[in-house]
Amino acid sequence: VAVGFVRPARPDDAGEIARIQLATWRVAYRRVLPKHVLDEIDEAFLALRWTDAVTAPPTARHRVLVAVEQNAVEQAVQEYVVGFAASGPFDDGALAADEDHTPDRENVAAVTDMLVEPRWGRRGHGSRLLAASVDLWRGDGFDSAVCWAFDADAATRKFLTSAGWAPDGATRALDVDDLLIPQLRLHTTL
């Protein structure tokens, strides 16, 4: 019997978070990002960054959560980290190129990453990550949230819009190896 749940990330999850991030990007974004860019991403470097995010977040409202699938196999319990979500207060990284940082955004959460490894998809892990994140955001005093998605990432856009998110009109282009990749920002009220 498989059971799925979400918990705060622990330092020993950092390597698995990095592996999931890289594996997911290489599948989900292979038509969005240049292959050589995806091939050159250093998983060990990502793991160090995730260790920092888990052990030394910039504020108490920065969070990293992991989705876990737990299976009982022959009287033993096996747990697999299958996805993760990272978020924090709205900051300059959540701005569009033509926006100024304004103080009225202090109650806005910003999703920096939310990924489920494709082989674990369609089992409710993304929905559990999003629901757990929303619960924490509300507890932290946020009243809305934003998330950037690649224009070409129909799966993420569909997932978020099915959960009540909508584009807020902000756009930007991510510069990857001199290739401008369009993104749009989605938002929701909590």
Label for each model-derived stretch:
Residues H62-V64, L180-R185:
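Short hydrophobic/aromatic beta-strand or adjacent loop that forms the aromatic wall/cage
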Residues G121, C147-R157:
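Conserved beta-strand-loop-alpha-helix junction that forms the acyl-donor binding cleft
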Residues G124:
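Glycine-rich phosphate-binding loop
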Residues P8-P11, L22-R119, S127-A132, L136, ...:
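Acetyl-CoA-dependent GNAT
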Residues L130, D153-T156, D175-L179:
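Short glycine/proline-centered loop/turn elements that form peptide/ligand docking sites
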Residues V146-A149, T161, A166-Q183:
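Conserved catalytic-core motifs of GNAT/GCN5-like acyltransferases
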